[in-house]
A protein has these predicted regions:
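S-adenosyl-L-methionine
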Residues: 1-19, 24-32, 46-48, 55
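Conserved acidic residues
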Residues: 13, 183-184, 254
């Protein structure tokens, strides 16, 4: 991917990823030695940024982490909100895996709420669930017939952690851009069109918040998916150009890179 070659070419030692999503670009910047700030408004993005960007793999006890993952893997299933909502009222996961998600997620809050391991354990659980879901990749709908992988057993694995420090935040991109000091490299990957990440990945948002929201429709989306507060101006065709202009005028960077595609409104 060409973006990955920009940092060494421009001798950057720091970068800001304002719409980090699943943190893949931020991870690659960190892997190449940059100090990275990863930001997004989604809770699941913040958790992944805490796991991959803020956590320094060289400064943690990997033995303790592996032992904890092994213990969580041994927990029996305990059906709860996740099983009822995403396995019975909808068909994203097999009930056997939904029950284990419920059990593991409860224990993470009960036993690791203040632990340095929490974002790593949550990321591991999210990725484990992703490997046994029955979707095409986004969570706007589930498959009519079960995906083959959905029959596999849920398994927590150690995420691919990186050495070095970094930081994370969960802020509105424009507000954060106005406050940040000048940086060497700014990466911008905002929503392209009407498709909203909040609804595309509503299960991950619920799994990370663990707030048992009211759900609606066949897809069992969070009820707050209807709220204006969960909608981005980048998802609105008329408002998007002006918001993008405001952002570009607000950032302070030696180099700014914007990622878009041919399905975008700009």
């Amino acid at each position: 991917v060409p973006i990955y070659g920009l940092a060494p070419h421009h001798t950057a030692s720091e970068a800001v990823d304002l719409f980090t999503g699943t943190t893949r670009v931020a991870q690659e910047f960190k892997r190449r030695g940059l100090s990275v700030l990863a930001n997004d408004v989604a809770t699941y993005s913040e958790v992944m940024a805490d796991c991959y960007i803020r956590t320094d793999a060289s400064a943690i006890d990997l033995g303790e982490l592996r032992a904890t993952l092994a213990e969580l893997n041994q927990l029996p299933g305990k059906p709860g909100y996740f099983t009822r909502t995403f396995c019975e009222e909808s068909r994203y996961f097999q009930p056997k895996n939904g029950a284990r998600v419920d059990a593991i997620r409860d224990v993470i809050d009960e036993s690791y709420a203040d632990s340095w391991m929490r974002p790593i354990l949550l990321t591991s659980l999210m990725l484990a669930a992703d490997r046994v879901d029955s979707t095409t990749g986004v969570q706007m709908a589930y498959l009519k017939g079960w995906a083959a992988r959905a029959h596999n057993d849920l398994e927590l694995r150690l995420p691919d952690l990186l050495p070095g420090g970094g930081s994370s935040s969960r802020r509105d991109a424009l507000e954060l851009a106005r406050e940040l000091p000048r940086t060497q490299l700014m990466y911008l990957d905002p929503p392209y069109n009407q498709h909203r990440y909040f609804t595309n990945y509503h299960i991950w948002e619920t799994l990370m918040r663990w707030d048992a929201p009211e759900a609606y429709g066949l897809a069992c989306k969070r009820i707050d998916s209807r709220d204006a507060s969960t909608k981005s101006l980048y998802n609105m065709k008329r408002e998007m150009p002006a918001e993008m202009r405001r952002l570009l005028h607000s950032i302070k960077a030696d180099l700014a890179v914007v990622s878009y595609n041919n399905e975008s409104w700009i």
